[in-house]
Amino acid sequence: ELSRSGRFLEAKDFYFDTLFDNVIDNFVENTKGKAKKVDVLFSVLGFTPEPIILTQRALEAKEHVIFYTATKDDCFEKDINPYLQKYLKDYKLVRFGDESFKTIYNTLSEQMKLLPAKEYAIDITGGKKSMVASAAIFGRDMNFNVLYVDYSDYNPDLRRPTPGSEILNWVYDPYKDLPEFF
């Protein structure tokens, strides 16, 4: 109702203040037994922090690195970072210098070298298509689990998934999806 009347900021505050804790709990409960724990989680950030928060809570990663673009500094500080600070405990922020494949791939690779681990995942939910494609290719090349947060129902009034309809979609699992070589 708030969004329909043009009160988008109030609708966003209502969502985070009233609904989001339940969304997190529901998401974590629904992914139990379906999502394996990982040592390191890489997340590509777009304009909404919710998917990153949901994925981190579900996977319980020991290390979490969130990547974002330089063009989002103002938006990041005002609209995204407060929610990351509120809902996540331990994470590292890394800014991509630009959105080129080479920069994204190399930045992800550098962070992987800094955080050696057995089990990695990369959440490709957020970011521009170039970022998502680069991150997915990197994840496949480096035997990461590649995943994203999807939804079964979208609420145009909220301008986000209907609370409780979020789903963790496991796109690629290196232990199951490696092609056979003859």
Feature-to-residue mapping (PLM):
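Long, low-complexity, Lys/Arg-enriched
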Residues: E1-Y120, S130-F182
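Conserved SAM-binding loop
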Residues: I124
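Conserved TIR/SEFIR loop-to-helix hotspot centered on a Trp-containing motif
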Residues: G127
